[in-house]
Amino acid sequence: MSLCCDGAMQKMPAGFYTLLCAQLFSSWADNALLIVVIADLTWRGESPWMIPMLKFGFTLSYVVLAPWVGASADGWKKSSIMWAAHALKVFGVWGIAVGLNPLVFYALVGMGAALYSPAKYGWMTQMVPATRLIHANGWIETATVCSAIGGVVCGGWWISASYLTSLSSLFPWLPFQPTGLSAAYLSVVMLFLVTVVLTFA
């Protein structure tokens, strides 16, 4: 009992809050991206069956990579794995944005997410005392749920005309103004880049 109480009184290390923010932005971008890609496929006039296949390909990446990603997360520096995971995500977003096969490149985003997940939890166990892991995991899961909701809401706004209008009003000095879904894809990439910065903070 004493150990539990002592652990409950411990403050989380500063690095945990950085990891928490990184998880928030990463999951936020993942969920927003799904909405943006669905809108993109609809506007391109792609076959309706491609929309459910997006999520299938994303999830399949977890299943296929499961035997390897855990061992990789244990054997490599966590921040390096998380950086590589988001580089893969950004590459996937780029491929979709320029019109390449959305199923293939969204699956690459899923691969990035599959790499990120065990590295995130591995890093958490290294920085958080054992007596605080339950609390830390609870905060991570709370951030994930909140970012899933926020990502869907943001994704819906990012594909709207009002978002482009807002960007033009806020940044009239830009040498170019984003059009169509380019602003939405760029916003997703920016969230991934923020996550990378937080990873190395």
Residue ranges and their predicted role:
Residues Y17-L34, K55-K89, F105-S160, L198-A201:
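Substrate-agnostic recognition of the 12-TM MFS/MFS-like secondary transporter fold
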Residues I51, I81, A136, A183-S187, ...:
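Alpha-helical transmembrane segments of multi-pass secondary-active solute transporters
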Residues A87-N101:
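C-terminal ends and interior cores of transmembrane alpha-helices
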